[in-house]
Amino acid sequence: MQNNLAYNAYSQNQAGIESPQKLIEMLYEGILRFCARAKVAIRNEDIEQRVYFVKRTTAIFIELINTLDYEKGGEVAHYLSGLYTREIQLLSLANLENNEDRINEVINVTKGLLEAWREVHNNETVAQ
């Protein structure tokens, strides 16, 4: 338990000093981590853990929606909003149906988003 508290404090401290670009990357990584745990819960028929990790993943997508800047992002922001909303729907279905395939769909989309985000962020860093 003590290690968990120390890790959480460290993570919160890291989040406090990271750039907005790094924070988005961390959110995508969190989605992947929680989805993996939700899949384990589905396999183990652990309803409580499945619900917990689906809720955590959903909360991250909601946070991503809330951080979208529609003025600067234009069409991309609207596209991402729709995509994030669809991922939330898939998570809800995964939870209702106890369906690992729905979680896999979310994982595949999130991996693509993370890869694209890293590429864009790396290109911005090189350009500076």
UniProtKB/Swiss-Prot annotation:
One of its GO terms (biological process) is bacterial-type flagellum-dependent cell motility. Its main location: cytoplasm. It is found in: Cytoplasm, Cytosol. Keywords: Bacterial flagellum biogenesis, Chaperone, Cytoplasm. Disruption phenotype: Cells are non-motile, flagellar filaments are severely truncated. Strongly reduced levels of secreted flagellins FlaA, FlaB and FlaC. InterPro entries: FliS (IPR003713), FliS_sf (IPR036584). Pfam families: FliS (PF02561). GO terms for cellular component: cytosol. PANTHER family: FLAGELLAR SECRETION CHAPERONE FLIS. Required for flagellar assembly and thus bacterial motility. Belongs to the FliS family. Interacts with flagellins FlaA, FlaB and FlaC; preferentially binds glycosylated FlaA over non-glycosylated protein. Requires the 10 last residues of FlaA for binding. May form a 3-way complex of flagellin, FliS and FliW simultaneously in which FliS and FliW do not directly interact. This is Flagellar secretion chaperone FliS. It comes from Campylobacter jejuni subsp. jejuni serotype O:6 (strain 81116 / NCTC 11828).
